């Protein structure tokens, strides 16, 4: 048995997996950049006070918490929204609005590892701060969708609005705690628990709320759902306003979606539109979640600032995309035999190619030619430059295609074209 193993809930990524992750990361970055979002990063750890501000001390058991040498309580970040809110207040509060930021980084949660759920995981997400216009919500939704289209992932997006149920709760004079309890049961899809809680509230308040709640939850579909629900909730003014806000947002979303008011999102700071995106992989279906949170900056003692954003679960995206091979683009440069003169020529050729931005590997083991070619073949390197005395004296080098076995002489002046 090996003495040291990786910590529970973490992973080592082999070179082939890292290449695939980099390909997907690059494509997602391309989409974020196309919307002119600017990349930032924040510390890996923050004060525990900051990390627990949204949820309270009960989150402690879900985090990696420690004290520094100054006896200050710190925690590894479980997500980026709190850190970005702090960063915004520290650095961007006087910047012209909207402020459009994105990030790609690792996060940490102390939870039981299972399929698609790790103690160290990667998130890629965005925050758009400063605009409360419906088109800002649509911008974020469209960017999340475009990213997954860019990587050719099959997915389904569900969009809802917390204001619809909130309007029902207000009409029946439910407390904030009662509304939060109902929303958390909806988020967990615990319908039996929901029925029990609603029944208890009905008995205590002598009201009939269950029917309206389930009417909202059960009505799903395209944009026509909004008009149907407006009829059913005509006397619920706040709910109708939320439906009209959602309709204004969807005016700018040209992609297919499912309206679903059963999206409650586990975090309590969401205030309006919410959405979730699902892949096809069982056990790792939800790959993205987001929405509007207009009170978050204020919660962290900043000026009231409307905000909307989302985060991809990058590891879940990797589980949901079809396996693919990354083409090996490196060029292997090897002398036909061991010789200081030929090694020097190989070094100069490698430097010329590297200076032009190409990936080049030199034979560093002093192998005989056949073994060097076997090494290149095992690594999946498709192009090998073989440097021989006679060829180099004529300003040429041999190019071997490892896929076809074909070999030809090319001019040294032409090596940048291979």
Swiss-Prot record:
Top-level taxon of origin: Archaea
Keyword Aminoacyl-tRNA synthetase: yes
Gene Ontology CC terms, in alphabetical order: cytoplasm
Matching PROSITE patterns: AA_TRNA_LIGASE_II (PS50862)
GO molecular function: ATP binding; histidine-tRNA ligase activity
Compartments where located: Cytoplasm
UniProt catalytic activity: tRNA(His) + L-histidine + ATP = L-histidyl-tRNA(His) + AMP + diphosphate + H(+)
Repeat in keyword set: no
Primary localisation category: cytoplasm
Similarity annotation: Belongs to the class-II aminoacyl-tRNA synthetase family.
Name of the protein in question: Histidine--tRNA ligase
